[in-house]
C-alpha cells in the first residue's frame, strides 16, 4: 500500500517538472529576442543590469592606480559625487562641473558619441593644465630675467657713478691746476703792468715837461686837455715839477704858464748883477730880449 502511494507521488512530480520544462522552453525564444533588441530610451547599462555609479567608481579607481605609476602625472582629483552626475547620462556642463579623471578607462560598451565627448573634455582639461604649467614656467623665467636685468642695471649704474666721480675729480684737479697757473701768470702780469705803468708815467711826465718847454707860454686849459687832465690837476702837476726844480716859470693871472729856462734865468741874473738895482719896469722891458717866448716849433720853422 505504501509503495503504491510513493510511486504515485513520484509520477505526479515528474509530470509537473515536465510541464514546467516545456513551458520555459516555449518562452525562451521571446526572451532572447527581447534581449537582442535594446529598448529605446533606456540606457544600455540599465538594460544590461550594470549600475552606472559602480562603473564610474571602478573607472576612477583604475585611474588612481594608473596615476600612482606615472612620475610626472598631475595629482589626481577626488572622485566626483555620484549625485553630481545627471541620472540620464548627460555629463555636459561648464568647466567647473564633473571632470573625466585623467587616464580613466572608458567602458567599451559606452556610446561612441559620449566617448568622444568625454575624451574631448579630458583633452581640454589636459590642455588647460599644460597652459597653466607653461604660464607658471613663463612667470618664473620672466622673474629670473627681471632679477638679472635689475642686477645688470645696478652694476651699470655703479660703473657710471664711478666714471662720473672720476671725471669730476680729474676736472677739479685740472681746474685747480689752471687756477694756480692763472694766479702765477696774473702775478707776473701785475709786476709787468706795474713796470709798464711806471714807464708810462715817466713817459707821460717827460712829454708833459717837453710840451711846456716847446710851447714856452702854455694856456693851462689847453695843457689839461692835451694830457686828459683837469685844469687844477695840470696846475698841481706844474707846481710839483717846480718844487722838484724840474722846470721853472711863472703862472700869470690870465691862466697861462710862462716857461723860463735855466739859461734865461742866468741871463736875467747877470743883467740884474750888471745893473745893480733894477726896477720892475726896466726888467720887464729887458725881459723880451732876455727871455725867448717864441715856441720852439715856430722858431725852428722860421729858421
From Swiss-Prot:
It is a single-pass membrane protein. Pfam families: DDRGK. The chain crosses the membrane at residues 3-23. Gene3D superfamilies: Winged helix-like DNA-binding domain superfamily/Winged helix DNA-binding domain. GO terms for molecular function: ubiquitin-like protein ligase binding. The keyword Transmembrane helix applies. It is found in: Endoplasmic reticulum membrane. Residues 106-160 have a biased composition (Basic and acidic residues). Keywords: Endoplasmic reticulum, Membrane, Transmembrane, Transmembrane helix, Ubl conjugation pathway. Its main location: endoplasmic reticulum. One of its GO terms (cellular component) is endoplasmic reticulum membrane. Residues 31-53, 84-160 are annotated as: Disordered. Residues 1-2 are lumenal. Residues 24-303 are cytoplasmic. InterPro entries: DDRGK_dom-contain, DDRGK_domain-containing, WH-like_DNA-bd_sf, WH_DNA-bd_sf. Interacts with Atg9; the interaction is transient. Substrate adapter for ufmylation, the covalent attachment of the ubiquitin-like modifier UFM1 to substrate proteins. Required for ufmylation of Atg9; protects the nervous system during aging, possibly by stabilizing Atg9 and supporting its function. Belongs to the DDRGK1 family. This is DDRGK domain-containing protein 1. It comes from Drosophila grimshawi (Hawaiian fruit fly). The gene is Ddrgk1.
Amino acid at each position: 500500500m505504501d509503495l503504491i502511494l510513493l510511486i504515485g507521488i513520484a509520477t505526479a512530480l515528474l509530470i509537473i517538472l515536465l510541464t514546467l520544462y516545456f513551458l520555459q522552453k516555449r518562452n525562451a525564444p521571446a526572451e532572447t529576442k527581447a534581449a537582442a533588441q535594446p529598448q529605446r530610451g533606456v540606457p544600455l547599462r540599465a538594460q544590461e543590469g550594470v549600475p552606472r555609479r559602480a562603473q564610474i567608481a571602478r573607472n576612477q579607481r583604475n585611474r588612481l592606480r594608473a596615476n600612482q605609476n606615472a612620475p610626472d602625472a598631475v595629482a589626481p582629483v577626488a572622485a566626483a559625487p555620484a549625485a553630481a552626475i545627471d541620472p540620464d547620462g548627460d555629463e555636459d556642463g561648464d568647466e567647473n562641473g564633473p571632470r573625466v579623471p585623467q587616464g580613466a578607462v572608458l567602458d567599451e560598451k559606452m556610446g561612441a558619441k559620449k566617448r568622444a565627448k568625454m575624451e574631448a573634455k579630458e583633452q581640454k582639461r589636459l590642455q588647460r593644465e599644460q597652459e597653466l604649467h607653461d604660464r607658471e614656467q613663463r612667470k618664473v623665467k620672466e622673474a629670473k630675467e627681471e632679477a638679472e636685468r635689475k642686477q645688470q642695471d645696478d652694476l651699470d649704474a655703479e660703473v657710471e657713478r664711478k666714471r662720473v666721480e672720476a671725471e669730476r675729480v680729474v676736472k677739479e684737479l685740472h681746474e685747480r691746476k689752471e687756477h694756480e697757473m692763472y694766479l702765477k701768470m696774473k702775478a707776473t702780469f701785475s709786476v709787468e703792468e706795474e713796470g709798464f705803468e711806471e714807464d708810462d708815467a715817466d713817459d707821460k711826465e717827460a712829454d708833459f715837461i717837453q710840451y711846456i718847454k716847446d710851447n714856452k707860454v702854455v694856456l693851462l686849459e689847453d695843457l689839461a686837455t692835451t694830457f686828459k687832465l683837469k685844469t687844477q690837476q695840470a696846475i698841481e702837476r706844474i707846481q710839483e715839477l717846480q718844487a722838484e726844480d724840474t722846470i721853472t716859470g711863472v703862472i700869470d693871472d690870465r691862466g697861462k704858464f710862462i716857461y723860463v729856462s735855466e739859461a734865461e734865468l742866468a741871463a736875467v741874473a747877470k743883467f740884474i748883477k750888471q745893473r745893480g738895482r733894477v726896477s720892475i719896469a726896466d726888467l720887464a722891458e729887458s725881459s723880451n730880449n732876455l727871455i725867448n717866448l717864441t715856441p720852439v716849433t715856430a722858431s725852428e720853422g722860421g729858421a
